[in-house]
Swiss-Prot record:
SUPFAM superfamilies: MetI-like. Residues 1-8, 124-134, 190-228, 299-306 are cytoplasmic. Keywords: Cell inner membrane, Cell membrane, Membrane, Transmembrane, Transmembrane helix, Transport. Residues 95-292 form the ABC transmembrane type-1 domain. It is a multi-pass membrane protein. It comes from the Bacteria. The gene is gsiC. GO terms for cellular component: plasma membrane. Residues 30-102, 156-168, 250-277 are periplasmic. This is Glutathione transport system permease protein GsiC. Coiled coil: none annotated.
Length: 306
């Protein structure tokens, strides 16, 4: 297992290098001139050229790329073109709100989704199954931005129960986490149901029932463990998507996180911040998938990695 983990970690190096090359080319193909945006609409050509020199944008593209890669290897992600602060500081100040929002969304989505999926599988083709799957389809179909605006209108504007802006207290997390986790809960419900339907028909489930074990214990002890392997895969993928895909939700709720920072950076063509954020999202996604693979062996001892 240790050798497998080490090999996967070493595989990060070429993957992140390829991602860094693609991201560098992508951001430099974005329409718009960062120097013009930073200098302002009233700046003349001389001022814009001076800003370009200060930002290093007057250098050849290959020289900019080498400067970017060599600094990144040393842990220096550069300076933000807009704030002139270190990119690492910009990301660090926004990371925790996004992480806590992701964890909050994932926790309730997994609990609700798995419970709905198990109930739907146990009472298959009956009203609990139909109700759970109807809610799940609705959760997948409803766009996140529309759900967010609906929740704001009802619970903040009309009822005045919950705040909409900021991340200072636990109340601020309720509406964004509901919005962000709705689709995940729906996916988890459908995936858990499909996995449990297969497990419930296995011989060991019938054997446990024949021994007089209660149905609740059969489902939770014998069914849950064996149905968890494909579900854990989906959990890992969804967590990665949540961590890097909260851009729309953070924009709707004006959330002070990485998604909002990325949107602002794209609008201002802040190349160093864009590059660093996408690299960070790629690293997070790869590490989450590694953790999921390791969890396979913990859930099912029959699985071993070499």
């Amino acid at each position: 297992m240790l050798n497998y983990v080490i090999k996967r970690l070493l595989g990060l190096i070429p993957t992140l290098f390829i991602v860094s090359v693609l991201v560098f080319l992508f951001v430099h193909m974005l329409p718009g001139d960062p120097a013009r945006l930073i200098a302002g609409p009233e700046a003349d050509a001389q001022v814009i050229e001076l800003v370009r020199q200060q930002l290093g944008l007057d250098q050849p593209l290959y020289h900019q790329f080498w400067h970017y890669i060599s600094n990144a290897v040393q842990g220096d992600l550069g300076l933000s073109m807009v704030s002139r602060r270190p990119v690492a500081d910009e990301i660090a100040s926004r990371f925790m709100p996004t992480l806590w929002l992701t964890i909050t969304s994932m926790v309730w989505a997994v609990i609700f989704g798995m419970a709905a999926g198990i109930i739907a599988a146990v009472w298959r083709n009956r009203w609990p199954d139909r109700l759970s799957m109807t809610i799940a389809v609705s959760g997948i179909s409803f766009p996140a931005f529309a759900l967010g605006m609906l929740l704001i209108q009802v619970f903040s504007v009309e009822l005045g129960w919950l705040p909409t802006v900021g991340a200072d207290s636990w109340q601020h997390y309720i509406l964004p986490s509901l919005t962000l986790g709705a689709a995940v809960a729906a996916v988890m419900a459908r995936f858990t149901r499909a996995s449990f339907v297969d497990v419930l028909s296995e011989d060991y489930m019938r054997t446990a029932r024949a021994k007089g074990v209660s149905e609740t214990w059969v489902v939770l002890k014998h069914g849950l463990r064996n149905a968890m392997i494909p579900v854990v895969t989906m959990m890992g993928l969804q967590f990665g998507f949540l961590l890097g895909g909260s851009i729309v939700v953070e924009k709707v709720f004006n959330w002070p996180g990485l998604g909002r920072l990325l949107v602002d950076s794209v609008e201002m063509r802040d190349y160093p911040v864009i590059q660093a954020e996408i690299l960070l999202f790629s690293l997070e996604f790869i590490l989450i998938n590694l953790v999921v693979d390791v969890l396979y062996a913990a859930i099912n001892p029959a699985i071993r990695y070499k």
